[in-house]
Amino acid sequence: MQRNFRKTFVGKVVSDKMDKTITVIVDIYKKDPLYGKRVKQSKKFHVHDENQEAKPGDLVNFMETRPLSKTKRFRLFKILSHAKSAK
């Protein structure tokens, strides 16, 4: 299987407390079938971060990979933007 066919997602890092693992939340907007209103749904993913470079608040791009642990099936592909540090 080529890497080009793997699913990619964009999400926001909410936690980096685990070793080489970040938790990313992805927001998806779906249309309600009855009323037609757009409803926001969120899902959390555990993502492998080999170099531990992503921090909470960062916007990241991640992709599918082979199972790395019981809960990790994704790996960090690119950091799109860094979080603004609070001073």
UniProtKB/Swiss-Prot annotation:
Keywords noted in UniProt: Ribonucleoprotein, Ribosomal protein, RNA-binding, rRNA-binding
Single GO BP term: translation
UniProt keyword RNA-binding present: yes
GO molecular function, one term: rRNA binding
One Pfam family recorded for the sequence: Ribosomal_S17
The organism's place on the tree of life at top rank: Bacteria
GO cellular component labels: cytosolic small ribosomal subunit
Family: Belongs to the universal ribosomal protein uS17 family.
Role summary: One of the primary rRNA binding proteins, it binds specifically to the 5'-end of 16S ribosomal RNA.
Entries under PANTHER family matching the protein: 40S RIBOSOMAL PROTEIN S11 FAMILY MEMBER (PTHR10744), SMALL RIBOSOMAL SUBUNIT PROTEIN US17M (PTHR10744:SF1)
Quaternary structure note: Part of the 30S ribosomal subunit.
Protein name (Swiss-Prot/TrEMBL): Small ribosomal subunit protein uS17
